[in-house]
Amino acid sequence: MFRSRKRIPYDPPGQRKNKGKKPEWKRSDQIFLNRRVFVMKGAIVAGFAALATRLGYMQIVRGDYYQAETANTTQSWRPETPVRGLIFDRQGRPLAENRRVWEVRVVPARLPKRGTPERERVRSTVISALRLPEVLVIDPSAVPEGSEETVHRRVANLLGLTKKETIDEFLRIVRIRSLYNYLVEVDQFSDDQAPMFRAAAQELPGVKVINRFDYLVENTAVPDLSVVIKRDVSREIAMTLEANRLYLPGIELNDTALVRSYPAGEVMSHVLGYVGPVIEEERQDPQNQTAGGQSYYEFDDTIGKLGLELWMEKVLRGNRGGKFVEVDGLGIETRLIYENPPVPGRNLKLTIDLELQAAATAALEEGLFFSNEDRYLKDQKKADPELERHEYRAGAGAVVVLDVRNGDVLALASYPLYDNQLFVEGISTRKYLEYTQDENRPLINKAAADHFPPGSTLKIFMAMAGLHEDVINANSAYTCTSGIWVPYTWDETRGDRYLCWLREEGGHGTLDLVSALERSCDVFFYNVGTPEQKPEGALMNLHYRDLFYATDQKGDLHFFEGLGIQKMHDNLHDRFWFGQATGIELPFEAVGLVPDPEWKNDIYEEGWSAGDTINTSIGQGFFLATPLQMAVNTAAIANGGQIHRPRLLLETVDDKGATIQTFATESLRQVKLQRDHLDLVREGMWRVVNVETGTAHGAYDDDGVLVSKWPYANPPGEEQIEIAGKTGTAEVGVKREDGTYQDSHAWFTAYAPYAEPEIVVTVFLKEGGEGSSYAVPIADKVLRAYFELTGARARGTILRQDELPIGKEHPAPSAGVVIAGSPTAVPDESFDQSEDNFVDEENPIDEIEE
């Protein structure tokens, strides 16, 4: 009924073209190419064709140029910088090392000509590979004459500098750098910031934003010398540049460069200081040149700038070497003609113990935090729990730890800290100004390079002076009613009030010397200091009346019978060691001040007054001391009168570990102290810490329970280690109408153990409050750390359970650094004094000066 339809067979598209053809049988050893293989083959052929074209261009078109460059060999002197000496703590822990890195350099004279594609290729390749930043520079030659300060001030405004002191410092830096540089680098920017500053700089003559590569090339005084573009380049980037070196004329790579590294971190920054790029002013300094006027330093060398790195520069830097080589036109060495190997610097081993230094620094920072929180922030923190530390009032201080037996400096902590690693490759002007204009001055070592009124800690030495001059004895007693009232010479009805710190409680009553030290009575020491003397025009000798602070009433009349300023000066300056440098191996040590009438007349053109003497008697007024001076003099009380020069250096060693020079203990002075006088003062200091009414013994909590101030050094249940000390609170700042002051410095100085002294700890907090409340807890932690070091207390409370890793017994200059071919060892006797090695014969190591 229905016809069937014939189905049309379906052929896949790939088989239709073969329809009707006989199938081709393929052998197993035959290779058949599809379309992809043909494309790949074409790409390979094209690549080889391009390579052949480039090679043809180089060999045929540019062949003569490359042949001439290769044949153009010259002889060149290449200086070799010595390995800088390393620095270790007393246990051999590394404090300053040399880290081996890759560096990229440029020889401006070997760069292709300006304006050529080859020059731009080199420039863009290096900038891209190294990610070089844009920098703001001033060209002094392009600034109109007479407009320098105006332009520089506008640059300061451009950078956002607002404080007058900051701007003045910026102007000073730019002015000095303009004397020695074609271009003065001011700051560097990210890629996002650069366009904004570039646009703003167009309105200022002589000011421009350029890449660091261009700055380094244009600022080079000697184009034939290589200049460091960047140090600490990754190996991958260095290898990439090395592989393309044929296309980068003028660019050199060095895989043996050393960068100074400070593994101990910021806790050692004030002791070590830092190195930084040498500037022309330093190169031209006669102290940094040979007798023939040749500088020890090349243009891109580093030099000690601060701390031990500066003080011991001549020892650490070693002796420069170099080699004469033959180089081709591309700067590649082809033959060594002559070599004078550099001599490495000597290593230094310090008296500092890194564990104790770190513990002292931590205790100091925590103590400042507590001082601010306890005095100012309790109520504020309730409202704002996230209050930042930078809003706190007290922000600076110091801790000094000395061995009383030999003057060894075991710890020298200063706060605030700073990052000395930032200076190694050259700190930016902006960051440097941040440091220098910080009101707490982080770059200043508060322990040795700054001085302050010492407050009642001076009473230790006033007591010794009074006993020595026989103005007081063991039985001397004075009554404190809360203060004294001293009438004017010209008007007995008017006068000045001098209060005791315990004025709110009505004073101390009648005290002898030991009790006056124990309770730190100011009135007692007003009497020790103020002399029996009749001022010119006065009706009678210097006198005072008892003052009752609560009612402002005056009581009985008393005549002074004390030392007077001249005897105070003679004892504090000429017997003890105030008002003069201690000689510690650090630059810029402050000397303090022991004032006298001649000094005041020279400075203020005023005569000396009884009030000046009264203030000096309790460590205030004009008197100034460094925390280091206080520690040195406290050590003399502990050891029986020996004033040691504080010693930071134990020895120097060469790269073989052999001792070259040992720094011996040095006595500055032996103070003749009578045994009975010394016993009285020591007893007073012992009572300060160990008697309930002593200012450093304890404090009552909210429940009226007396709580010890020594929970770390002398915890309950353990054998007590007796400590002797003296608190101090120096009032400073604006004087209020009631005779008190706005701020006060906190001090505490102590030694331990009492019977057989080993250690002195001195604590200072700038504007830190009362010494008994805020300096004593810091000393408690530091003493505990020392006791843990010596085994007198178990480790783990302050120090780690396990000790910090100890370095090699005899570390080498290349410790932690792999250097091919060890440098020649330093001779045991001294450095090579030949002119070739640039050693200054007029300044041997033992005569290093500030």
Regions found by a protein language model. Name each.
Residues 142-149, 153, 159, 163, ...:
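Beta-lactam-recognizing serine transpeptidase/beta-lactamase-like catalytic domain environment
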